[in-house]
Amino acid sequence: MYSTGLVRWLVLAVVAVLPLVSALGLVPYPDQDPFYYPPSGWQNKKPGDILRSRKIQAASVGALKFNLNAWQLLYRSNSNTAHTPSYTITTVLVPHNANKKRLVTVSSPENSNWIRCAPSYAFRYSGVLELTNFEPRWEQMLYMLYLEEGWVVNAPDHEGPNSANAAGISGGHMVLDSMRATLNSKEIGMDKDAKLIGHGYSGGSIPNGWAAGLQSSYAPELNIVGWSLGGTASDPMMTLDFLDGSATAALSLIGAVGLVDGYHDELYDLFNNQIWTDEGKRAVWTAHHACVYEMVFLFMNQVIQSPKYIKGGKNFSDYPQVAKITNKLTMGTNPKYVPRKPVFMFHAAYDEEIVWYQANNTAVAWCEQGANIRFLTETNKALNHVVTYLLNLPYIMEYMRDRFAGKSYYNGGCQFDSMSEYPLFDTSVLGDRFKEILQITLDLLGKEIGPNDSIYRAKLANHQNPNKVGIIHPSGMKSTTITPGEGGNDSPASKIVRKTGKASSGNSSTESTSKNQTQSGGDTTNIDQYSADGKGAGQGNN
């Protein structure tokens, strides 16, 4: 019996490899578009400085025009250190009647090693239905929720010019510098004191999580009011191991290739001369010439860490140079990089792609280092990786509205909850906001995008502030705030699960199990359902 997650990958992978339609040359690919290449002297600019700017017709799946204003900015940034010049592009969507004091930056789960899979290219209108490179395209449809609020949306190509997937620190720099660039754009005209929120799910959680940790030292001037992270892939080695041999084994290969692309000087010779077999090198070439769904189709259930692809069938963690970098890129291990603004994290206990342990470990580590976090575990067994994202959209929206409104977030402490409900269809949570979700359909069919719609007018007629929550009620979500350092079953330390073996990548030495308690009702749910050890664990929910 296939899980809905696997069906999603199967269907979209088949669609991706069918030559149904193409852009017919109407929009040049990024590697053939001069806009993607910086002018001479760009290295001397400051991070966030705009190098090129253009107005575009934004669209979904190539053919469904967005009825709003959109710009693309080529801007100066940095790669994996704060002093290593790089550059990338961001796409900025400005709805009608926009509130220029609100900016939501979304890190798309690109999950690819090819520049032609970049979100910026997926935003372009070609006039032809395009079903390839669907990974960033499907999430773009969700941006309507933010745009209907009147918020400006900023979507950077966080993998940069080398398409360095999962490179962590590099992506964090590019996310923060995309905010700077958006604020610097005179054409867009953002308020210089605009409130900023960063959001990222799955592959997008990596650059977004690193942006959260880097912000206080790298971009302290930005008026960040919150970060939203879901399905957080916070431990690179655990992710590589967990996915290997599963239906989405391609993501393990893509992640390894991304590490090499992001840390070329440190890892390229090692991988090219000592790690990859000839078949492995062919797989790397394929990764550099395909988007994620094609890759999933081609490498389904393949064991990457095997003699077929790696000399001697070794594991990535067997190489100290690799383990050193993945340890460095594990969120929560360095006290220098801790979020200093409120963070909302949510994760499915039965996530078949990104194991729950790593996200929980990071939340606990950050909490113990003074972060302000709410970590929500979804315990319903029907909630897989993608469904968890979709069904938590009301909570994401509620969180963002509250942050923009300046509300306190658990008194600056930490909160660890679990729940089993389907939040999207819980009327006590969603209420009339279901009507607003229906607006997405109209938006994609060409309706003028922005808060000047029937719901907006109805709120005004009822003397409601359309920019306040007022409708969503977080029933079943309230529980006692947990402060780092408290003892007993309610302390963050009791919630952590550290696994030994290959998947731990040497980041943890203590093996334990944990029960995540729903504090509002007192019930307990055993989260220790997956073993993070061994290859092929990602198939556990299929």
Curated annotation (Swiss-Prot):
One of its GO terms (biological process) is lipid catabolic process. The keyword Transmembrane does not apply. It catalyses: a triacylglycerol + H2O = a diacylglycerol + a fatty acid + H(+); a monoacylglycerol + H2O = glycerol + a fatty acid + H(+); a diacylglycerol + H2O = a monoacylglycerol + a fatty acid + H(+). The gene is LIP3. This is Secreted triacylglycerol lipase LIP3. The active site is at 202 (nucleophile), 351, 385. Keywords: Disulfide bond, Glycoprotein, Hydrolase, Lipid degradation, Lipid metabolism, Secreted, Signal, Virulence. It is found in: Secreted. GO terms for cellular component: extracellular region. Disulfide bonds join 117-291. Residues 1-25 form the signal peptide. Residues 466-542 are annotated as: Disordered. Belongs to the AB hydrolase superfamily. Lipase family. Class Lip subfamily. Induction: Constitutively expressed regardless of pH conditions or exposure time. InterPro entries: AB_hydrolase_fold, Lipase_secreted. It holds the Pfam family LIP. Glycans are attached at residues 315, 360, 452, 507, 516. GO terms for molecular function: triacylglycerol lipase activity.
